[in-house]
Amino acid sequence: MGQKVNPIGFRLGVIKTWDSKWYAEKDYAKLLHEDLKLRSFLKKRLYHSGVSKIEIERAAGKAKINIFTARPGLIIGKKGSEVETLKKELAKLTDKEVYLNIQEVRKPELDAQLVAENIALQLERRVAFRRAMKKSVTSSLKFGAKGIRITCSGRLGGAEMSRTEWYREGRVPLHTLRADIDYGFAEAKTTYGIIGVKVLLFKGEVLSGK
């Protein structure tokens, strides 16, 4: 079970929490679609800003969006000019007042989503997949990860037949619910087709009572 299911969804309500924090009754479907629209828009718009996670909170017809990023300077811009433009674009998209909160990810090497996106970027630049995987594993362990597993699937190295290769170092206990496991997925669009990159990063165990 732990091998197949999304590690974050599996731990929701145990040690992980939801990325959308709001409650609705009759407008639930509409707001859910709005969340999806906001997330895909922000991911495309801030593609080069290293966005790790987008949290959405709603209350009284207003939306607060927390953006976790490795490069906050790119999103904020000179004297906050970029943020103001982004706010206007989001308000137009949702017809609501939008508040933005930009939070810096201090150690991108310990964020599974950012690690996956970094590997995907290297694959698009024609770096050998094994080298990209090993480099990311080494740097994550150096920054304090207890274990990491990276999987690449697709036409690796331009091979005729697609295959899956993975590389792991340290412990990655997928069945242990108290294990703090971060999960990230990214796609590399290469000339041979799409290569999927999955990253499972074990940060340690969350002890009960915390």
Curated annotation (Swiss-Prot):
Domain KH type-2 residue range list: 38-106
GO biological process: translation
Matching InterPro entries: KH_dom, KH_dom-like_a/b, KH_dom_type_2, KH_sf_prok-type, Ribosomal_S3_C_sf, Ribosomal_uS3_bac-typ, Ribosomal_uS3_C, Ribosomal_uS3_CS
UniProt-listed Pfam families: KH_2, Ribosomal_S3_C
Top-level taxon of the source organism: Bacteria
Molecular function, one GO term: structural constituent of ribosome
Record keyword RNA-binding present: yes
Keywords for the protein's UniProt record, in alphabetical order: Ribonucleoprotein, Ribosomal protein, RNA-binding, rRNA-binding
GO CC terms in record: cytosolic small ribosomal subunit
Family to which the UniProt record says this protein belongs: Belongs to the universal ribosomal protein uS3 family.
Subunit structure: Part of the 30S ribosomal subunit. Forms a tight complex with proteins S10 and S14.
Function statement: Binds the lower part of the 30S subunit head. Binds mRNA in the 70S ribosome, positioning it for translation.
NCBIfam families for this protein: rpsC_bact (TIGR01009)
Record PANTHER family: 30S/40S RIBOSOMAL PROTEIN S3, SMALL RIBOSOMAL SUBUNIT PROTEIN US3C
The protein, known as: Small ribosomal subunit protein uS3
Organism, as annotated: Geotalea uraniireducens (strain Rf4) (Geobacter uraniireducens)
